[in-house]
Amino acid sequence: MSGHHPIVDALAARPPWEPARLTRALARLSGTIRSVSATIDPTERRWHELVAQSLATAEGDHRPPLWVVLGDSTAQGIGASSIDHGWVSRLHAALHDAGRPYAIVNLSRSGAHSTHVIDEQLPLLDHLPYAASIVTICVGGNDLVANPYAPRLTRRLERLAEAAPRGSILCTL
């Protein structure tokens, strides 16, 4: 996958997912959490492949509108029965069926906090071949689990809203 595009290279350079302490503890107690956790790395690798395909298409003669997805496991589709059943894939299929095909560039990462989106995911938008038509950002659950102190969480999400491209769709918990 390396060598195709700066975004693809950045995704390939990410270290493997490491579960948070709470996730590790819950996985010891729950087979369901253990099995969902086992899908995280394969799902992320599949998104990387799809991003590479979308960027290759976007750099060709046909330039479909770009939909960039940022965020955490909700944007990855973790917990769905397959990558095709996550909300991003389902909405992408519905748009395609309605005659509005988009190239998806899913830069999300399971376990991401709002600061990860700001510091790691948003800067990758500078490497898109052209401006995204849609940017969706779904994050907040991991922020809440890590530090539920409301004023701090509110400041983080306000900072994210300020850093996001104009017209982004931000969904948080």
What are these regions (language model features)?
Residues 119-173:
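Alpha-helical cap/lid subdomain in secreted, periplasmic
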Residues 99-113:
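A short beta-strand-loop structural module common to alpha/beta enzyme folds
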Residues 75-76, 111-114, 141-144:
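Solvent-exposed loop/turn segments at secondary-structure junctions
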Residues 78-83, 116, 147-151:
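Short, solvent-exposed loop/turn segments at secondary-structure boundaries
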Residues 1-69, 77-81, 96-100, 130-131:
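N-terminal secretory targeting modules
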Residues 84-97:
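Short catalytic helix/loop segments, enriched in acidic residues and glycine
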Residues 66-68, 105, 135-137:
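Conserved beta-strand elements of the Class I
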